Amino acid sequence: MEWSQIFHDITTKHDFKAMHDFLEKEYSTAIVYPDRENIYQAFDLTPFENIKVVILGQDPYHGPNQAHGLAFSVQPNAKFPPSLRNMYKELADDIGCVRQTPHLQDWAREGVLLLNTVLTVRQGEANSHRDIGWETFTDEIIKAVSDYKEHVVFILWGKPAQQKIKLIDTSKHCIIKSVHPSPLSAYRGFFGSKPYSKANAYLESVGKLPINWCESEA
């Protein structure tokens, strides 16, 4: 199974013309993130056959030079967003990795699908592209991963992500969940949750190579 087949199946099942028309207008008349060519970067960097872990985000960062198509990741020269800083703090506490760069392309290449449930956003307006159709598309992506893969780790931070559990066959996949790494909630159970070592322990238990969460040149 490849993304091209899954995309074909989804777009055959659902009509995304209204969303397509909306996005054409938005990209023509407003500043929208990420750049058009990066909307699907999560799928470009993580082929379907390589998926070991799915980390669900919400919508892209809405500031300049941030979003580039991977959930939680920002472009190499951007400032660290607070949630990502907390993710790295937990990573250091969990398995001793100290990451210096704010982009997560190496995770994506390791097999971590960094999937936002909404893939575009208008500059400075969080959730501005909610309910235009992306949720339908990404729900189908989650279901496809659940249906066609085995032994994938789904990392679900915060209530919106955890609402997606209903799309996942928990009998053949691993669910790791906690509060969101946002500064508003991280101290209520994200810190100390050890998602990275738990994910690797599960992967190794089913005969898969663990994720290299530490800094990579990739």
From Swiss-Prot:
Record keyword Transit peptide present: no
Pfam families reported in the protein's UniProt record: UDG
Protein family membership: Belongs to the uracil-DNA glycosylase (UDG) superfamily. UNG family.
Entry-linked NCBIfam families: PRK05254.1-1, PRK05254.1-2, PRK05254.1-4, PRK05254.1-5, ung
Gene Ontology terms, MF aspect: uracil DNA N-glycosylase activity
Localization terms from the record: Cytoplasm
InterPro entries documented for this protein: UDG_fam1, Ura-DNA_Glyclase_AS, Uracil-DNA_glycosylase-like, Uracil-DNA_glycosylase-like_sf
Name of the protein described by the UniProt record: Uracil-DNA glycosylase
Task performed by this protein: Excises uracil residues from the DNA which can arise as a result of misincorporation of dUMP residues by DNA polymerase or due to deamination of cytosine.
Any one biological process term the GO annotation gives: base-excision repair, AP site formation via deaminated base removal
CDD domains per the UniProt record, alphabetical: UDG-F1-like (cd10027)
EC annotation from Swiss-Prot or TrEMBL: 3.2.2.27
UniProt entry keywords in alphabetical sequence: Cytoplasm, DNA damage, DNA repair, Hydrolase
HAMAP family: UDG (MF_00148)
Intrachain S-S bonds: none
Catalytic residues (UniProt): D59
Reaction equation(s) it catalyzes: Hydrolyzes single-stranded DNA or mismatched double-stranded DNA and polynucleotides, releasing free uracil
Taxonomic source organism: Staphylococcus aureus (strain MSSA476)
